[in-house]
Design a protein with these regions (language model features):
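Generic hydrophobic/packing signal
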Residues: 56-61, 70, 79, 93-96, ...
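Charged/polar interaction segments and conserved charged motifs
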Residues: 1-15, 112, 116-146, 231-261, ...
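Small/flexible residues
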Residues: 61, 77, 89, 135, ...
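PAPS-dependent sulfotransferase catalytic domain
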Residues: 153-357
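A short, structured active-site edge motif that brings together acidic residues
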Residues: 81-85, 249-252, 358-362
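PAPS-dependent sulfotransferase catalytic core
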Residues: 2-201, 365-372, 413
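PAPS-dependent sulfotransferases, especially Golgi type II membrane carbohydrate sulfotransferases
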Residues: 2-52, 265, 270, 278-329, ...
């Protein structure tokens, strides 16, 4: 479901980005429904009355939590993470040395970014809407295949006729394996690297419809693990006047870094940046995966990089949360073991009220963004490797573990 985000080329990202922008603007202004065109011409993402932001480290369980919450009938949401829209606007590496965006960074087209962030937002409603899903498929295609000139109007007609996207992609020589909702088997080789957004996992669930003017009274649910490094910037530059509540989702270090280790070693869309040559023990790929923390390294052990990603993300959330008045810390372990009560706590925190559609989803949540079948304490399959990294960890790791209250290994499910 929530497409990881970006793969940006170090060599010529501007050419690729400009091509994606051109095709996206064409779709936004000429291909999607007139109703959606009207919304995007008059409104921006900061026009919502309230925002619920999920902040966590990668492989922290945010995709599952996001998918549950976006089924609440008083919410709106994107179809996945919003990193791709920041990348389209050049607000990413290599413009920055890492995923950290300074709170005072203002050198970007704010109006355009806020409009772009609204481009695929839909409303949770049981009946859903086919045109919404078709429009969202179209606005994402230039980000996913920016170096291809596709007949977007014809693609839209075929989608509305009921032709599957798989069939349409095959017609243009694009393996469906490279797109959303593909088979669980891993690709034999990495996907095309010239993308703004990686294809897998992004989808609009069937209970979403297009935005109307009245929907801005609802709560917008957002999540992207990269937000861990830009919370003050989000508060000051994107939503300075919006009621923003933050859910800090935590997960024990062993399970998180084990999930990261799995994801790095799969050709399944977790690649994010071309940072140059990588010499990481345990990794044979050529692209960086997941978030790019400050102090990232290109040499060493992959398991240590995974630990760094967990530590740095949560350290920055702990530091950046002071920019917000309302922050709720939630354990992913509780989302798994006491789903109903934990979701109820979040719903009350966000002032959302009851939702029959949400209740149904809580009882039978979707399986999203998994690298392997979910299983408690799966990290113990490579316990020696994981603990070797934890034993080498520095003082910052110890401080984060203590602040997040993960000092008892018996609780690391």
């Amino acid at each position: 479901m929530g497409g990881w985000g970006v793969v940006s080329l170090e060599e010529a990202p501007d050419d690729l980005r400009n091509q994606a922008k051109r095709n996206y603007e064409h779709i936004k202004n000429e291909v999607i429904t007139e109703e959606k065109q009207s919304i995007l011409s008059k409104y921006q993402v900061n026009d919502f009355d309230s925002v619920l932001l999920i902040a966590t480290a990668p492989r922290g369980g945010s995709s599952l939590l996001f998918d549950i919450l976006r089924h609440h009938e008083e919410t709106c949401s994107l179809d996945g993470e919003h990193d791709r829209w920041l990348t389209l606007n050049g607000i990413c590496y290599p413009a920055f040395e890492s995923d950290v965006i300074p709170a005072d960074f203002e050198s970007f087209d704010r109006e355009k970014l806020l409009t772009d962030l609204l481009a695929e937002v839909g409303v949770a409603e049981r009946s859903g809407g086919r045109t919404h899903r078709v429009d969202n498929t179209l606005v994402r295609l230039p980000l996913q295949f920016p170096n291809r000139e596709l007949p977007y109007k014809r693609i839209r007609e075929k989608l509305l006729e009921g032709v599957s996207l798989d069939e349409i992609l095959k017609e243009f020589g694009i393996p469906p394996l490279q797109y959303d909702e593909y088979s669980e088997q891993d690709a034999n080789s990495p996907f095309e690297t010239e993308t703004i957004e990686d294809r897998p996992f992004v989808s609009s669930h069937s209970h979403k419809r297009s935005l109307t003017v009245d929907d801005f009274k609802r709560t917008l649910v957002l999540k992207a693990s990269g937000d861990a490094y830009r919370l003050p910037w989000i508060r000051e530059q994107l939503f300075p006047e919006t009621d923003v509540k933050v859910v800090h989702l935590t997960r024990n270090p062993a399970a998180s870094i084990n999930g990261l280790y799995d994801g790095w070693r799969l050709n399944r869309g977790f690649q994010t940046y071309n940072v140059g040559d990588l010499d990481l023990e345990g990794y044979s790929g050529s692209l960086w995966c997941y978030d790019l923390p400050p102090g990232w390294v290109s040499e060493g052990k992959l398991i240590d990089v995974c630990l760094m990603q967990w530590v740095q993300a949560h350290r920055h959330i702990l530091d950046g949360r002071v920019a917000f008045d309302d922050v709720l810390r939630v354990r992913f372990e509780d989302v798994l073991t006491d789903t109903s009560s934990t979701i109820k706590e979040i719903i009350e925190f966000a002032d959302l009220g009851e939702s029959a559609l949400l209740t149904e989803n809580v009882k039978n949540p979707n399986k999203v963004m998994t690298t392997k079948d979910p299983r408690h304490a799966r990290w113990r399959d490579r316990e020696d490797l994981v603990k070797s990294a934890l034993n080498r960890a520095d003082k910052t790791y110890t401080e984060v573990v203590e602040k997040l209250e993960y000092t008892e290994e018996s609780e690391w499910i």
